[in-house]
Amino acid sequence: MGDRGGAGGSRRRRTGSRPSIQGGSGPAAAEEEVRDVGAGGDAPVRDTDKDGDVDVGSGHWDLRCHRLQDSLFSSDSGFSNYRGILNWCVVMLILSNARLFLENLIKYGILVDPIQVVSLFLKDPYSWPALCLVIVANIFAVAAFQVEKRLAVGALTEQAGLLLHGVNLATILCFPAAVAFLLESITPVGSVLALMVYTILFLKLFSYRDVNLWCRERRAGAKAKAALAGKKANGGAAQRTVSYPDNLTYRDLYYFLFAPTLCYELNFPRSPRIRKRFLLRRLLEMLFLTQLQVGLIQQWMVPAIQNSMKPFKDMDYSRIVERLLKLAVPNHLIWLIFFYWLFHSCLNAVAELMQFGDREFYRDWWNSESITYFWQNWNIPVHKWCIRHFYKPMLRRGSSKWAARTAVFLASAFFHEYLVSIPLRMFRLWAFTGMMAQIPLAWIVGRFFRGNYGNAAVWLSLIIGQPVAVLMYVHDYYVLNREAPAAGT
C-alpha cells in the first residue's frame, strides 16, 4: 500500500495534479498524520469554512477526532459567552410575568383608574394644603439668604449666624411635620411630597451655609486672594467664575434650589446648550413611566396587599411568607421603574433645562458585590452630600470611620422614618429599623460573600427587604384606621 501511495503521488506530480498531502487523502497522508499526532500529542486542527464547518476536502481518512479539552460549563474551559442563556432568562421572565398578568386580569378585572389618583393628593378640590406648604418653603430659603448676606458684610458674628441657621434648619423639619400631622385635610401622599420638598430644602440650605462659611474662612486667611479662594471652594470649574461674596444673589440661590444636586458650589459646570431632542425623550419617559407605575400599583400591588391582611391577622406564617413573595415581584419591578424615572428621566430633564453639566446621578449599583457599594452608588446626589457635609467633617473632628459611617446610616434612617411615619400619622420605626439593619447586613455580606454571591445577596436584600417594610406599615395602618374605628362603633 505504501508503494502504491508513493506511485500515486509521483503520478499526480507528473500530470500536474495537486499533491495528496494538501487534500489530506491517501494512505501516505494518513500515515503522516499519525506520525504528527504521535509527536505532538494532539490532533491537527482542521481548516474551517466561513460557516464554521470543517473543510472536508477531497479525502475521507479522519483517523482522529478527539483532543484534550474541558466541557464548556467547566470553570477550566475559559468559556464565557453565555449570551444565549441570558436571552433565555429574559424570555422566561417575560413569559412568567405575562402569566401573572393574565391571572391578575382574570381574577380582578381591570382596576386601573387614573382619575382615582387625584383623590390621593386632594380630599377637597378647593383645599390644597400640600401645595401651600411647598410655597411657604420659600420663606426659609429667603431667611437663609438674608443671614448669609449679613454674615458676608460682618453685620452678624459667626456664632449668631450659626444660631440663626440652626433655628431655620430645625424649623424646616418641624414646621411641615406639625402641619402634616395635625391638619386633617392633607392626604398621606400629599404629605409625603411636601415633606420630601422640605427635606431636600434642608439638605440644600445646610450645604449653602457650609460652603459660604468655608469661603469666609478662606477670605479671612488670605484677603488678597479672595477671588482664588472662591474658585477653589467650588472645585475650579466654570466658564464664568463667580467669587465670594458675589455669589450671594437670589438668582444664584434659586438656581441652586432648582438644580438637580444637593451640594452647593459657587460655579457649577454648565452644558453649552439645551438639547431639545434629548429633553423631549426624557419628558416622554417621565409621562409614560408615571402612568405605568400608577397602573402597576393599582392593578398588581393593591390586590396583593389587600389579600395579605387576613394572614397577618390570623398569624398564618406560611401564608404570610407566600404573600410576601407574591408582593416582592411587583414591588421590586415598580422600584426599578421608579429608579429609572427619577434618577435618569426626571433629573436629566431638569439638568437639561437648567444646563446643569454634572449628570452623574447614579453609578453601576446593579453590579454591587457589597451592601456598602450599593449605598455609595445608587443615589449619587445624597451620597455626595453625606460625604462632603457629614462624613468628612466628622473625620476632621477626630471621629473614627466606623463611627462616621454609623452616623450616616443613623441620619438616613431618621429621614426614612420621617418621610413615612408622619404622613401615615403613626410611629412604628419599621423604616428606621430597616435602615439600621443595613449596618450588620453590610458586615455579613462583606465578610462571607464575594463576587457573584455578594451581588446575589445585595439583590436578595432589595427584593425581599422592601416588601417586608411595606407589609409592616400597611398592616399597622390598616389596623389603626380600619379595625379600630369598627371596634369603636
Swiss-Prot record:
Catalytic machinery residues: 416
Sites annotated Important for catalytic activity: 417
Biological pathway: Lipid metabolism; glycerolipid metabolism
EC number: 2.3.1.20, 2.3.1.76
Single GO MF annotation: diacylglycerol O-acyltransferase activity
PANTHER family per UniProt: DIACYLGLYCEROL O-ACYLTRANSFERASE 1, STEROL O-ACYLTRANSFERASE
Quaternary structure and interacting proteins, as annotated: Homodimer or homotetramer; both forms have similar enzymatic activities.
Name the UniProt record assigns to this protein: Diacylglycerol O-acyltransferase 1
Record organism: Bos taurus
Lineage, opening ranks: Eukaryota, Metazoa, Chordata, Craniata, Vertebrata
